[in-house]
Amino acid sequence: WESTGIKTLHDLKGKKVYVGPGGGGAGTDIEEIIELVTGMKPGDYESFKAPWGEGMGMMRNGQVDAMVRIAPVGAAVIQEFGLSKPIRFLQIEGDDLTKLDLYLKVPGRSISQIPAGTYEGQTNGDAVNTLSFVAGMGIHAGISDDVAYTLTKAFWDNIDEIKASASLAFGL
């Protein structure tokens, strides 16, 4: 929230931060990013891991000071926060971007931007640098061509329903 005064990852020291679900890669990646940029590890800030929906509830209810959420730019799951009170996205710039060089060498990781005014209630006056990731799907190489075709056809025949229920499919 804008009211927390948190503007960069450096401001997370001593704060309660929701980083994603336990047991998944998101929370681990987020903790790694915070450490690369700031040198802080969990303990320097209070790291919370829970399912995405629960984490969003923690943010809504003020149980955490900051939240990191994987979602495409413009996603409704983020917009809902801006509809209730002013929100700020944490900027990563200058030397902090350079600290992520090694992290960004992994294929599928890059820097992207959230333009100013993307979300109702967004207080950032300028575009905000953010991390972006490529997501993909695959199947076992031993699956028959017929089954692979059936799965692919079912996916694309139902793409509108998939987009409506899964924010990560937003850009498909």
PLM segments and residue spans:
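Second-shell loop/turn segments in exported
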Residues: 16-22, 134-142, 172
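Bilobed "Venus flytrap"/periplasmic-binding protein-like clamshell domains
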Residues: 2-61, 160
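Short helices/loops that flank or line small-molecule/ion binding pockets
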Residues: 53-67, 79-85
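Paired acidic/hydrophobic, glycine-rich loop segments that form the ligand-binding mouth/hinge
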Residues: 65-70, 90
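Periplasmic-binding protein-like
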Residues: 155-171
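C-terminal lobe and pocket-closing loops
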Residues: 88-150, 154-156
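Short, charged, surface-exposed secondary-structure boundary motifs
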Residues: 29, 77-79, 98-104
